[in-house]
């Protein structure tokens, strides 16, 4: 979406959010003032992506709450995934992922799509078949949601979008064979803790 020129205040918000992540220092609250629009929040996010010393390789996508969908006229939000925090694991293996001490941390079940080519932006919606043609692999996975700001989710979508979508990493499992011939919804990702399922998608 078109983004406004970044104000001095929003530039300061971006610097503070990025600085907290780089230093792993907790933030007690959102810095300065919450954005009031999607355009403002994504402008802050874009500035932070430019500041971040890593390569952008993908996006996490999350659903907005029903109230926020109505308020902002959008269904989903996105946040960046960077190369150093994207990992693939083989079946039966494990990986240790860092989170922000004294901040927010969660593990969320995800379905991970790895694209074989970039999807060109257009002025129309792509069909499901067209979108599927861009996908190289599909796998069950997990998102490490973490931020130096413990209250990031409590403050809502404007806070989450501004701070990298509350993303700190993505783990992709083995690629699912023959995924393109399966019916929608054939794959379920689950998160278990001590053999108890705590989340699924």
Language-model features: where?
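Catalytic-core "active-site belt" of small-molecule-metabolizing enzymes
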Residues: 2-201
């Amino acid at each position: 979406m078109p983004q406004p020129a970044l104000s001095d205040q929003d530039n300061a918000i971006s610097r503070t959010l990025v600085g907290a992540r780089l230093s792993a220092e907790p933030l007690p609250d959102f810095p300065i003032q919450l954005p009031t629009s999607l355009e403002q929040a994504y402008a802050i996010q874009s500035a932070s992506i430019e500041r971040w010393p890593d390569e952008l390789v993908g996006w996490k996508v999350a659903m907005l709450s029903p109230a926020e969908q109505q308020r902002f006229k959008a269904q989903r939000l996105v946040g960046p995934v960077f190369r150093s925090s994207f990992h693939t694991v083989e079946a039966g293996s494990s990986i240790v992922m860092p989170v922000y001490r004294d901040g927010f941390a969660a593990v969320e079940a995800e379905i991970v799509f790895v694209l074989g080519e970039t999807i060109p932006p257009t002025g129309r919606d792509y069909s499901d078949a067209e979108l599927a043609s861009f996908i190289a692999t599909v796998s069950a996975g997990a998102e490490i949601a973490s931020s130096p700001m413990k209250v990031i989710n409590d403050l809502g979508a404007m806070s989450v979008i501004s701070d990298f979508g509350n993303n700190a990493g993505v783990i992709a499992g083995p690629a699912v064979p023959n995924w393109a011939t399966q019916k929608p919804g054939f794959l379920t990702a689950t998160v278990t803790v001590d053999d108890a399922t705590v989340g699924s998608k």
